[in-house]
Amino acid sequence: MHKRRVVVTGIGVISPNGIGKDNVYNAMISGKSAVRLVDGFDVSTFNTRIAAEVRDFDPFVFGLSHDEAVRMDRYVQFAVVAADMAIKDSNL
């Protein structure tokens, strides 16, 4: 079996603790928790009212067009935007 090398050249992050590598890093080193009361949808039928939600994500701010955004699930939007961030971060 051939061992293949992988080189990480760029990072893109969409997470409950922030959007972008610098925001996430700063939240992590400051010990900031992303767990809060859920406000993204009705949780009255669930046993818990807290979660770590991705907040303040606007796909249009990060370059997706309206046509692209409406064709993508929210999580696909996260992946596409994070991949774009990683490509830009790589300076390739």
Task: Give names to the regions the model predicted.
Residues 1-92:
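Conserved "HGTGT" condensation-loop signature of ketosynthase/thiolase-family condensing enzymes
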